[in-house]
Curated annotation (Swiss-Prot):
Native organism taxonomy: Eukaryota, Metazoa, Chordata, Craniata, Vertebrata
Organism: Homo sapiens
Keyword Iron belongs to the record: no
PANTHER family per UniProt: BETA LACTAMASE DOMAIN, HYDROXYACYLGLUTATHIONE HYDROLASE-LIKE PROTEIN
Free-text cofactor note: Binds 2 Zn(2+) ions per subunit.
UniProt-listed Enzyme Commission number(s): 3.1.2.-
Record's protein name: Hydroxyacylglutathione hydrolase-like protein
Function description: Hydrolase acting on ester bonds.
Primary enzyme class: hydrolase
Family affiliation: Belongs to the metallo-beta-lactamase superfamily. Glyoxalase II family.
GO molecular function: hydroxyacylglutathione hydrolase activity; metal ion binding
Binding site for Zn(2+) 1: H54, H56, H110, D134
C-alpha cells in the first residue's frame, strides 16, 4: 500500500492510496481535483473511489468537479452534506479496494458526521494507516464545531485502540502551532519537547504524517494507548483547571496573556508524570493530544 501525500490550499492534505499490485487507487479528502488527477496520471493508476472525512469545504469541495471528470466515481462518507455523495457509510462498515481493506470509524466532535478511515492490506509488511481528517492531527485535534467535548474525547479514545504501529495521516498541517501550545500547557513534558524538536527538523511537507512508535511516545499506539492522553482546547475560560505540579501552575499563569484560553473539566497529575488524563469541559479550538 502506497500513500501519496498531497499538500493543497493553505495547510490541507489530500491523499492518494494506491494498491500497488492492481494499480487501483482511492483518494481521501479531495479539495483540488486537478492536482489529484495530475498525480493519478503520473502514477498510472485507476481511481475508483473518494473517501471524504467530513463535509467542510476544504475537504470536500473538489468532489463535484471530480465526479464530473470521472463519471461513475464512488464518493463515500458518513454525512449527507458531503458534496456529490454517492453512498453514505456507517460506523464499523468495511470496504475493500483490491487487497486494501477499509474500516470506517465514526469520530464525531469536529462535525457530527465525521468519519475516519483505517486501512490495511492483506499479506503486506507495511503498517496500517489511519486517515483522520480533522479528528486527530499531529499533537492535536480539530475544534468541536458541531459535537461535544465528550464526543471528541470518546472519538480519540477509540482511535487510541488501533494498533501501535499505525501511521496517522491527518487533514491539516498544524504541527508546530499544536506543539508550541502543548509546550505552554505542559512545560514539564519531555515528550512534547522532543516532538517539537522532531517537527522543526523535518521538511514541512512531511509533518502531516505521524508515525506511531517513532521514539517520542506520540502516535496512536504510543501516547494515546499508554494513558498519556491530554485533550485540551482553546476556549474562553480557565475555570476548573487544576495542575498538581507547582512549576506547571506558575508557568501557566505567567503565560496566561499569550496562551489561548482553555476550559478544562477535570484535573490531572503533573504533565511530566507518567500518566496524564485531562478531559474537557468545552472545546472551541485546537486540542492538545499526547
Amino acid at each position: 500500500m502506497k500513500v501519496k501525500v498531497i499538500p493543497v490550499l493553505e495547510d490541507n492534505y489530500m491523499y492518494l492510496v494506491i494498491e500497488e499490485l492492481t494499480r487501483e487507487a482511492v483518494a481521501v479528502d479531495v479539495a483540488v481535483p486537478k492536482r489529484l488527477l495530475e498525480i493519478v496520471g503520473r502514477e498510472g493508476v485507476s481511481l475508483t473511489a473518494v473517501l471524504t472525512t467530513h463535509h467542510h469545504w476544504d475537504h470536500a469541495r473538489g468532489n463535484p468537479e471530480l465526479a464530473r471528470l470521472r463519471p461513475g466515481l464512488a464518493v463515500l462518507g458518513a454525512d449527507e452534506r458531503i458534496f456529490s455523495l454517492t453512498r453514505r457509510l456507517a460506523h464499523g462498515e468495511e470496504l475493500r479496494f483490491g487487497a486494501i481493506h477499509v474500516r470506517c470509524l465514526l469520530t464525531p466532535g469536529h462535525t457530527a458526521g465525521h468519519m475516519s478511515y483505517f486501512l490495511w492490506e492483506d499479506d503486506c509488511p507495511d503498517p496500517p494507516a489511519l486517515f483522520s481528517g480533522d479528528a486527530l492531527s499531529v499533537a492535536g485535534c480539530g475544534s468541536c464545531l458541531e459535537g461535544s467535548a465528550q464526543q471528541m474525547y470518546q472519538s480519540l479514545a477509540e482511535l487510541g485502540t488501533l494498533p501501535p504501529e499505525t501511521k496517522v495521516f491527518c487533514g491539516h498541517e498544524h504541527t508546530l502551532s499544536n506543539l508550541e501550545f502543548a509546550q505552554k500547557v505542559e512545560p514539564c513534558n519531555d515528550h512534547v519537547r522532543a516532538k517539537l524538536s522532531w517537527a522543526k527538523a523535518r521538511p514541512l511537507s512531511r509533518r502531516g504524517k505521524r508515525v506511531g512508535g517513532e521514539g517520542t511516545g506520540f502516535g496512536v499506539g504510543g501516547a494515546l494507548r499508554q494513558g498519556l492522553m491530554v485533550t485540551g482546547a482553546c476556549g474562553h475560560s480557565r475555570r476548573g483547571m487544576r495542575m498538581t505540579c507547582p512549576l506547571c501552575r506558575r508557568l501557566w499563569a505567567r503565560s496566561a496573556s499569550t496562551t489561548p484560553s482553555c476550559g478544562w473539566r477535570e484535573y490531572g497529575c503533573c504533565p511530566g508524570a507518567s500518566t496524564v488524563t485531562w478531559t474537557l469541559r468545552k472545546a472551541s479550538g485546537d486540542c492538545v493530544l499526547g
